[in-house]
């Protein structure tokens, strides 16, 4: 095996958008060309393998992390529930966007956890990757292939023929993390970051919420509604959905506020209750929501915030938690708050039960309708045409 030169142009991470300036690990190649050379190795088949740490990545909002692909910083304290602290290793919402002149692209990755699937969500969604190509004539991303982790090997691999110069997007696993990721290209091929988006939105839309925001239960990563909104609106996203654990602790508002976002989307109601109705310790809307949103607005004044109701499979209208945040929304608007968008659950599901796997979590049909509802709210918040 020998080292090979690699041209990496404009590599950047969303971590540059954090309020605190950290050394950009993903930009090492930009500052030290020797590191870029050493990061690419040619195997016996003539494939040049590049570590994912040197690829243009999005959805990775922090650099002060325990593991490179973590969604939250290493200093998350016990003031945040254990579910979040454990699932911060999941790569939901993370993706690579780049252009290459290689005629074939190869991928291999090692998942963080050996649990690669769930009873109601396949391994392709939990631990797989999705590859998309940009169609310039039609002005949209098209799905090319999905890579899965082999149960026996506990590793994933995928090889795809490619039209040189075509932009590529790779969604990472939803309910698993990545310990190692590598892109394989032809020996003399190059990789370049894509130019700024035509939408004009280059700061991320940050989604914070529950298992549904996390991506449960899409059959593959690209179909999760957060990822669909990103592609459909041509905006970068950060996915901070935490299964059963999106409960709006005050500390989480501090972490979100560190991200230099274009918009925040709050979608936590499924994991929360009301103290007046028995509630749940540490999970009550009437205790957590208002301090959370006020702190977020204080730290990021002027950044639009979307307040979402909880999705209801049967579309029965607002429940007590929805009515609570509607009253809070009206209160904040009366105080003079601007750039605040309210998202009712009216269009999140079709109402016929076809959009869910278990009367709660959306399947791919449900994810499509969710993406349209949330996409419309984000479009309104960002004033996109």
Q: Where is each model-derived feature located?
A:
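N-terminal secretory targeting modules
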Residues: 2-4, 10-13, 20-204, 379-384
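Intrinsically disordered, low-complexity acidic regions
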Residues: 214, 219, 235-238, 248-251, ...
């Amino acid at each position: 095996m020998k080292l090979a030169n690699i041209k990496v142009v404009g590599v950047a991470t969303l971590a540059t958008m954090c309020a605190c300036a950290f050394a950009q690990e993903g930009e090492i190649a930009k500052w030290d060309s020797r590191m870029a050379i050493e990061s690419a190795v040619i195997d016996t088949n003539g494939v040049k393998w590049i570590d994912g740490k040197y690829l243009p990545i999005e959805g990775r909002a922090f650099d002060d992390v325990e593991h490179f692909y973590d969604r939250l910083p290493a200093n998350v304290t016990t003031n945040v529930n254990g579910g979040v602290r454990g699932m911060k290793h999941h790569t939901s919402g993370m993706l690579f966007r780049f252009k290459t002149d290689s005629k074939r692209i190869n991928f291999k990755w090692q998942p963080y956890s050996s649990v690669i699937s769930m009873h109601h969500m396949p391994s392709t969604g939990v631990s797989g990757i999705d590859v998309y190509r940009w169609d310039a004539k039609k002005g949209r991303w098209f799905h090319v292939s999905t890579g899965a982790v082999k149960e026996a090997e506990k590793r994933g691999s995928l090889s795809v023929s490619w039209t040189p110069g075509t932009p590529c997007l790779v969604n990472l696993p939803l309910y698993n993390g990545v310990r190692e990721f590598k892109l394989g290209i032809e020996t003399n091929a190059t990789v370049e970051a894509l130019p700024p988006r035509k939408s004009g939105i280059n700061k991320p839309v940050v989604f914070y919420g529950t298992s549904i925001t996390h991506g449960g239960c899409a059959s593959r990563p690209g179909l999760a509604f957060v990822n669909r909104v990103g592609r459909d609106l041509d905006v970068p996203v950060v996915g901070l959905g935490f299964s059963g654990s999106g409960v709006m602790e005050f500390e989480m508002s501090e972490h979100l506020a560190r991200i230099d976002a274009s918009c925040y989307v709050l979608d936590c109601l499924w994991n929360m209750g009301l103290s007046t109705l028995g509630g749940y310790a540490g999970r009550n809307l009437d205790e957590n929501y208002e301090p959370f949103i006020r702190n977020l607005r204080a730290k990021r004044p002027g950044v639009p915030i979307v307040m979402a109701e909880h999705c209801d499979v049967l579309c029965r209208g607002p429940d007590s938690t929805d009515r609570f945040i509607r009253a809070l929304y009206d209160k904040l608007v009366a105080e003079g708050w601007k750039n605040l968008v309210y998202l009712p659950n009216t269009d999140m599901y079709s109402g016929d039960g076809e959009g869910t796997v278990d009367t709660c979590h959306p399947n791919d049909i449900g994810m499509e309708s969710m993406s349209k509802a949330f996409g419309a709210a984000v479009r309104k918040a960002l004033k996109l045409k």
